[in-house]
Amino acid sequence: MQPNPDLVRAIANRYAANLRLCLPLRRTSLQLARAVHGNIITFGFQPRAHILNRLIDVYCKSSELNYARQLFDEISEPDKIARTTMVSGYCASGDITLARGVFEKAPVCMRDTVMYNAMITGFSHNNDGYSAINLFCKMKHEGFKPDNFTFASVLAGLALVADDEKQCVQFHAAALKSGAGYITSVSNALVSVYSKCASSPSLLHSARKVFDEILEKDERSWTTMMTGYVKNGYFDLGEELLEGMDDNMKLVAYNAMISGYVNRGFYQEALEMVRRMVSSGIELDEFTYPSVIRACATAGLLQLGKQVHAYVLRREDFSFHFDNSLVSLYYKCGKFDEARAIFEKMPAKDLVSWNALLSGYVSSGHIGEAKLIFKEMKEKNILSWMIMISGLAENGFGEEGLKLFSCMKREGFEPCDYAFSGAIKSCAVLGAYCNGQQYHAQLLKIGFDSSLSAGNALITMYAKCGVVEEARQVFRTMPCLDSVSWNALIAALGQHGHGAEAVDVYEEMLKKGIRPDRITLLTVLTACSHAGLVDQGRKYFDSMETVYRIPPGADHYARLIDLLCRSGKFSDAESVIESLPFKPTAEIWEALLSGCRVHGNMELGIIAADKLFGLIPEHDGTYMLLSNMHAATGQWEEVARVRKLMRDRGVKKEVACSWIEMETQVHTFLVDDTSHPEAEAVYIYLQDLGKEMRRLGYVPDTSFVLHDVESDGHKEDMLTTHSEKIAVAFGLMKLPPGTTIRIFKNLRTCGDCHNFFRFLSWVVQRDIILRDRKRFHHFRNGECSCGNFW
């Protein structure tokens, strides 16, 4: 019997009416949709496409994608609305692979601009800019006309991967040609593209030009331009823009400025901006307070952070929570119990909370606890792995970082460019040049060669592996540079003794309009110190406050003192210490002690050492430097006194360790090491080298033997077994003639070993690179890049 058409129509209308009541994100809506769906199945009703499409839409917007897909698969020939809805649903949930699968199965004749827009938007929102651009090009090739939404979406993807100004201009021209270029949403996206690729002031100028031409600016227009200024360090222009804004839009702009100041390390400026907000009568909101907490956390302002926390708790009209920011505040201020207590009291601990906890332990150097947290986490995402891998590397656990990176891949996580950056940092810690090259090759193969984070990590890795030319090459070929890129190259050149070139790069950076931050100034001061560029170093130090409004920290003052001591200006160094705006820290006294050791200034050196004994009595380096000074002048009673002081205080000298990498295998040597299978052959080879070097004038400096041994022969034997000498002899035996030898040591190399390496490079006619705790030494033809000051 044929069903009554009127009855069918009535049932269909009732279902449609019920589904129209379903609103996204309401639990009752999902329940109603399920009831309708169940009723359809129970009574065997065959609904038309518009009802099925509405059901799929409700399921997708309620994040019930399994139900949506089940219903979608039951449709013999889904129409373009159903396909587009599924694409949007998968993209919103971050499952780009399934979204792409639905899109690619749609016949070209069924696709339209809306379906392309959904897929392009999905790529952009899920940080796959290249795929967004490629699909945009394919869309045009297949004859589909992009609309305003298409351009806004693809430009969001372009902002992620823009290589250069030419690419930005090409898309800008295409938008103008289509008539979409003056639409506010598209113009906002163009401002974002130019700002995010602002490797030069001209691009930021282009962003401002687009902004000025927007006829109907909305809140996003102002905040996008503001964010562009802030992220590129142009806070003065940001403040000018702020003054021209309507009062009802200033809250978001203030938030952007505050967040930008915090991200760039200008914490006092961020807090001053908060004060201005309050005095202007602008209410702080849920976006302001987390930035304030971050500023307090990074600046160590625990009491202010607690006051903000207490204030928010008293505000009944605040329904938001920022427990994750509070966890960071207490961790960074060393209050681990309070941080853990906040975490434990969280009513719902999501993955973000766990990652915040993990990051807190990692950033505070508590790697043991971080490992336990990581193991405890029932769910992990790629960010969890990134935090742990980078944390291991940054805390000196390079080998564990590489193992965890391999484990991550075995667990089925595809490494992103940030994960690769963590692995590359691990290679930098170990000096694992061959491994680093392999990761570089993988990055190129996968298509991450334009990644900013990976590029910056590669510069540092090659520099720390002693291959500064490859660090230069990575920098030159990076499509986009930020201040971290410039900092990495300046640091690389400074570490390797290319101080003048480091200064040239810094000046080039300034000419390009890139504003230095506190790290930039620290690296250029270090470069000046290593190269003995006293006048330039002092000029750059003075510019910190006078030009860039960056108050120097203890680390900057330490570099200045090191610079002055290098040139023997001890009275100037003392004057700097006396005029410090804070109590001298350990690193400042250590810089003074190091300079005294090199120049033999015993009186001032003893003062510096006494200060260090008071600040860090457990640090073995102070005792060793002071012992070296006394030993150099034959004061063996004083050497014995310092050694006894170490024993009485329970201070143990860190074991010296040197290593060399050969074909991804690392060979490690300790002092007096006989554990290596080829140890006997290495010592015989060392003796032969010593004879040849003595013939050419090398005399072992026995003042670096920190024991009162009567026999010079015995003293010389003790010097022969230093770990870096064993490592370099092994390298000379095993590596082909002409190969550069790269040795890494965990402590500062002694004066005799330094002299030994100078003569050795002349005898064997090879370049030898030694990385010790302080810097790099490039030995060639009997000379060292450090100029015998380290």
Curated annotation (Swiss-Prot):
Keywords: Repeat. Residues 664-694 are annotated as: Type E(+) motif. Residues 588-663 are annotated as: Type E motif. Residues 695-790 are annotated as: Type DYW motif. InterPro entries: DYW_dom, E_motif, Pentatricopeptide_rpt, PPR_At4g14850-like_plant, TPR-like_helical_dom_sf. SUPFAM superfamilies: TPR-like (SSF48452). PPR repeats lie at residues 48-82, 84-109, 112-146, 147-182, 183-217, 218-248, 250-284, 285-315, 319-349, 350-384, 385-415, 416-450, 451-481, 482-516, 517-551, 553-583. One of its GO terms (biological process) is RNA modification. Pfam families: DYW_deaminase (PF14432), E_motif (PF20431), PPR (PF01535), PPR_2 (PF13041). One of its GO terms (molecular function) is zinc ion binding. Belongs to the PPR family. PCMP-H subfamily. This is Pentatricopeptide repeat-containing protein At1g25360. It comes from Arabidopsis thaliana (Mouse-ear cress). The lineage of its organism: Eukaryota, Viridiplantae, Streptophyta, Embryophyta, Tracheophyta.
